[in-house]
UniProtKB/Swiss-Prot annotation:
Pfam families: OSCP. The gene is atpH. The keyword Ribonucleoprotein does not apply. It is a peripheral membrane protein. This is ATP synthase subunit delta. F-type ATPases have 2 components, F(1) - the catalytic core - and F(0) - the membrane proton channel. F(1) has five subunits: alpha(3), beta(3), gamma(1), delta(1), epsilon(1). F(0) has three main subunits: a(1), b(2) and c(10-14). The alpha and beta chains form an alternating ring which encloses part of the gamma chain. F(1) is attached to F(0) by a central stalk formed by the gamma and epsilon chains, while a peripheral stalk is formed by the delta and b chains. Its main location: membrane. One of its GO terms (cellular component) is plasma membrane. It comes from Streptococcus equinus. It is found in: Cell membrane. NCBIfam families: ATP_synt_delta (TIGR01145), PRK05758.2-1 (NF004401). F(1)F(0) ATP synthase produces ATP from ADP in the presence of a proton or sodium gradient. F-type ATPases consist of two structural domains, F(1) containing the extramembraneous catalytic core and F(0) containing the membrane proton channel, linked together by a central stalk and a peripheral stalk. During catalysis, ATP synthesis in the catalytic domain of F(1) is coupled via a rotary mechanism of the central stalk subunits to proton translocation. GO terms for molecular function: proton-transporting ATP synthase activity, rotational mechanism.
Length: 178
């Protein structure tokens, strides 16, 4: 995506998030955005909307179908997209909206890598640790099992890492011996 298109996508995304904050409907618009993005993932909707072969009328009909199950704010947003003939960028805009929601709500996904599966108690302790260390609210807790870390855990949140794995400790020990 070129810089001009990226700027356009970011502006539309930012505008929708600002409206959601102003109207105190972040949660509602966030779930609608996730639902629309899942439609894009499950179908070839992005290809359809960006196709030069498909007529504008067909694209408008399809977006109108999406509007039927949307809130007033999302309907208005989709209407602006149609009026400005930006439907080809709808998926990218919605992805931008999702990123902006994360920033606005400070809810980041937490990726935890362990050698064995975590218990519910351990998950709660990790959520508390992340809130304390990084000052963020948990979005989703994504658990990865990687036996090569041998023990401990690696937590990734918003490009920040806590690595208490035995593998890392052994690597540090090895470096200190040299």
């Amino acid at each position: 995506m070129d810089k001009k298109t990226q700027a356009l996508v970011e502006q539309y995304a930012k505008s929708l998030v600002e409206i959601a904050i102003e109207k105190d409907s972040l949660a509602e618009l966030q779930s609608e955005t996730e639902a629309l993005l899942s439609v894009f993932e499950e179908t070839n909707l992005a290809d359809f909307l960006s196709s030069l072969v498909v007529s504008r009328d067909e694209k408008v009909k399809l977006v109108r179908l999406l509007q039927e199950s949307s809130s007033v704010y999302m309907n208005n947003f989709l209407e602006v997209i149609l009026q400005n003939e930006r439907e080809a960028f709808l998926k990218a805009i919605l992805e931008g909206v999702q990123k902006d929601f994360v920033i606005a709500t400070n809810q980041h996904d937490i990726v935890v890598t362990t050698a064995v599966a975590l218990t519910d108690e351990q998950k709660e302790r990790i959520l508390a640790l992340v809130a304390e260390k990084f000052g963020v609210k948990a979005g989703k807790l994504v658990e990865n099992i990687d036996e090569s870390i041998l023990g401990g855990f690696v937590i990734n949140v918003n490009n920040k890492v806590i690595d208490t794995s035995i593998r890392r400790q052994l690597q540090e020990f090895k470096m200190n011996l040299k």
